[in-house]
């Protein structure tokens, strides 16, 4: 498997086959058996009821996961070499409704308390 950007990496053949098989079943958009099975599986994994939101790209998944956790006047702390900073383009600003990525430093792309303090200091 290649874990490149979702805009450049090919779809794995097994995933492609699973999508073809799913396309021949129920109507999409959460009223189907496949969505219900996924909700149940994630609920069992996390120990609570889950409603899975299907999205087309990893960029959308990353940004939609952060959006509910951060108000428009807030920020998300990440390393300045984090995937969301380096590879997601303008998507975080759009999906976070203006909230900022607050860039922190740290050795080997791991944030440190000092890096966080320096990253949020300009606020």
Residue ranges and their predicted role:
Residues 3:
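Pyridoxal 5′-phosphate
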Residues 7-11:
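Short polar catalytic/cofactor-binding loops
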Residues 12-58, 80-81, 85-87, 91:
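Conserved N-terminal alpha-helix of the aminotransferase class I/II PLP-enzyme fold
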Residues 47-50, 71-74, 97-99:
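Short coil/turn connectors at secondary-structure junctions
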Residues 49-70, 103-106:
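Conserved core of the PLP fold type I
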Residues 68-86:
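Conserved PLP-anchoring active-site segment centered on the Schiff-base-forming lysine
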Residues 96-123:
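PLP-dependent aminotransferase-class I/II
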């Amino acid at each position: 498997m290649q874990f490149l950007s979702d805009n450049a990496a090919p779809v794995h053949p097994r995933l492609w086959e699973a999508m073809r098989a799913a396309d021949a079943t129920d109507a999409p958009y959460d009223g189907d058996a496949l969505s219900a099975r996924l909700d149940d599986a994630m609920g069992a994994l996390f120990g609570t009821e889950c409603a899975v939101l299907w999205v087309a790209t990893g960029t959308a998944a990353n940004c939609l996961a952060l959006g509910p956790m951060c108000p428009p006047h807030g920020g998300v702390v990440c390393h300045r070499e984090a995937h969301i900073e380096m590879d997601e383009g303008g998507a975080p600003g759009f999906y976070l409704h203006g909230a900022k990525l607050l860039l922190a430093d740290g050795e080997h792309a791991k944030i440190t308390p000092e890096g966080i303090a320096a990253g949020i200091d300009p606020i």
